[in-house]
Amino acid sequence: KYSRKDNPAVELMRRVIAAKKKTDLSNHDYYQYDKYQKITLALNDLKKEQLEGKFFSKRQYLLDQVETSPYNGKLTLPVSIDETVSQHIYRKDPKTEKDIIKGQQSNGIGQVIQTGEILNTALKDAFTDVDIYDDYVRLLQYPFPSPIGRTGISFYHYYIEDTVYVERDLCYHLQFIPANSQDFGFRGELYVLADSSLHVKKCNLYMPHNTDVNYVKNMKIEQEYTRLDNGEWVLSKDDMIAELHVNSVLQDLLVVRNTRLTDYAFDELPKILFKGKAKVRHDMDAMNRDEAYWNKYRQVDLTKSESSMDSFIHQMENSKGFKYIIFFVKALMENYVEIGGGTDGKKSKFDLGPVNTYISKNFVDGIRLRLAGRTMAALNPHFFWDGYAAYGTKSNDWYTGNIFTYSLNKKKNSPFEF
């Protein structure tokens, strides 16, 4: 039976949690670092029978895009990649933090559906940065107790496995699991430096299989910390691998987020950098960086399929039946279908959807048929309409609804974008 009393693992973790204050970067008056992030979305776990089937065998460009993922060893088909280079700056007094986007580019399926930018934003929001030195880790819109957070001792069970060397550093190797298997928490392992700093050198976090969160089938987070010349330990590597399963009909998805943090500095920063309330600022040329820029600042190499994404999309756009494929993809990903534009470079003025509401069934209406749609910013960037008409085949009743929205700010696609 697990006991916290006189437990060496618990006593060690109490010391690790207490030592957090000494190693907090916010103790400095200023700090900054550079950050590179790559997020890849791929069809996951493709089977040999699928690839030999009629759909793939008739589309060589799809077969050429298939590769074995280095993260799960499964056959995958990358469909989008988003890269961002940014600078994070911090000032203690008055407390201010900002991210300055230096470079950003997106390639893939988002290029051929007008709201692809929303897809990239949603992925970044769901698979956000993880800092185990926070008390809670917000992930997939849920707060998870950190294994070294203030509630860690009561939430997790810890077990010392051994003392091992990680690179050249002697570390305590610990395993941890939620005390209650039904709770939202991680399981995983920590490698804690066996010196006075008691800082985490490396950690692996896993989403328990019985945690039913936003279609996540499996998730792993790998983090590594690096010692700076001044003796401080800082996060340098943060990778996240998530396998998503929606249902038995749709293909599983793989999301891989690679983050690298470099060039930490603690010099005083000019006041002008902190001007304004916006927490995120874009450099003027951030969206127009050339290949030489990305070759210089890319911290994680692209896979063969990621690097050929432009060619893949070009072949897809020129393939037979492309419009039908995009129709299906958009219906699945966004629940809306563009009417006019979208595939020829022009933005849609009107979308049909939500598609999953077109046919439904209930006790009163029997089979209920519904037609719905919405206007887009290409029609008017300030004024939007969203409405529907539905008919119950059993009740013979008609139902209608209309929503009118006016946006003060000019929108690119829909009234709900940020």
What residue ranges belong to the model's regions?
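Outer-envelope beta-barrel architecture signal
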Residues: 29-31, 348, 367, 381-385, ...
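Transmembrane beta-barrel strands of outer-membrane/channel proteins
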Residues: 35-37, 387-391, 418
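Structured extracytoplasmic
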Residues: 2-173, 177-186, 243, 247-360
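Membrane-embedded beta-strand positions in outer-membrane beta-barrel channels/transporters
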Residues: 13, 189, 222, 370-372, ...
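Outer-membrane beta-barrel channels and translocator barrels
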Residues: 195, 230, 378-380, 409-413
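Extended lipid/amphipathic-ligand handling interfaces
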Residues: 188-194, 220-230
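Outer-membrane beta-barrel translocator/channel fold
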Residues: 215-216, 244-253, 405-418
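Transmembrane beta-strand segments that form the barrel wall of outer-membrane beta-barrel proteins
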Residues: 176, 204-208, 350-361, 371-372, ...
